[in-house]
């Protein structure tokens, strides 16, 4: 679709990250530069997400986790929050057919109880439509917060210890990972190899703090609506110049 096949790209790069996480930042600033309301940037960001998803799929990426809405984002202006909550409805209506055609499987992490009914219905419909697909997993972090995720996992583990389902000595890193929201992902791809943040901000903002322990980070000043295929390839090229040590020398 974008003129570059995964096979030829793999000859250029030493390796493709199997799991990429993206903090999609800069929609509001992108709109402001164009003298448009912030919501205009969020709408443009949907087009970037579609292109990045298809490109990642062509490259052989297994999981793409995108930070769509954090637990802290509820403090934004109500009209903006309402617009963002409607974005999944618009995005899935417009792009699920092409994502489905490209064998993309849609999943999510996050607390669903606070999501509007229309948002949740659109998300569940997209998940159901693509559930048998075997290609890239497009994993939406929606109403997600890393600290809340870990806190919830600790509560469940503590309850299982109280119920004598677990002994304290059974608690390992692997067991904790099984209580996190990413436990539905394939075991080998639960943790991101590469985390990308757009817009020039240099922080994680509560995105996958447990899973990113050994991730490589790529920060770019490019605003999210401008982060398209060429920018993703640039990020992966940079990743391929890294030596991943996983705490070793």
From Swiss-Prot:
Broad enzyme group: transferase
SUPFAM superfamilies reported in the protein's UniProt record: Undecaprenyl diphosphate synthase
EC number assigned by the record: 2.5.1.-
Residues at which substrate binds: 26-30, 38, 42, 70-72, 74, 76, 197, 203-205
Domain of life according to the entry: Bacteria
Comment on bound cofactor: Binds 2 magnesium ions per subunit.
Alphabetized PROSITE patterns for the sequence: UPP_SYNTHASE
Protein name according to UniProt: Isoprenyl transferase
């Amino acid at each position: 679709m974008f003129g570059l096949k995964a096979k030829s790209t793999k000859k250029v790069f030493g390796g493709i990250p199997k799991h990429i996480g993206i903090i999609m930042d800069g929609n509001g600033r992108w709109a402001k530069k164009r003298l448009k309301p912030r919501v205009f940037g969020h709408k443009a960001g949907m087009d970037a997400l579609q292109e990045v998803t298809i490109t990642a799929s062509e490259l052989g990426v297994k999981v793409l986790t995108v930070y769509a809405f954090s637990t802290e984002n509820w403090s934004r202006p109500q009209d903006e929050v309402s617009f963002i909550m409607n974005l999944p409805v618009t995005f899935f209506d417009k792009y699920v057919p092409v994502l489905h055609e490209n064998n993309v499987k849609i999943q999510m992490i996050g607390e669903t109880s606070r999501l509007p009914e229309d948002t949740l219905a659109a998300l569940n419909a997209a998940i159901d439509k693509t559930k048998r697909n075997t290609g890239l997993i497009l994993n939406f972090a929606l109403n997600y917060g890393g600290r809340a995720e870990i806190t919830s996992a600790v509560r469940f583990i503590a309850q299982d210890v109280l119920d004598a389902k677990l002994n304290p000595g059974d608690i390992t890193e692997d067991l904790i990972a099984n209580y996190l929201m990413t436990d539905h992902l394939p075991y080998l791809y639960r943790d991101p190899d590469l985390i990308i943040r757009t817009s020039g901000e240099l922080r994680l903002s509560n995105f996958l703090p447990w899973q990113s322990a050994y991730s490589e980070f790529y920060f770019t000043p490019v605003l999210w609506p401008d982060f398209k295929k060429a920018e993703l390839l640039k990020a992966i090229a940079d990743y391929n110049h890294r030596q991943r040590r996983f705490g070793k020398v």
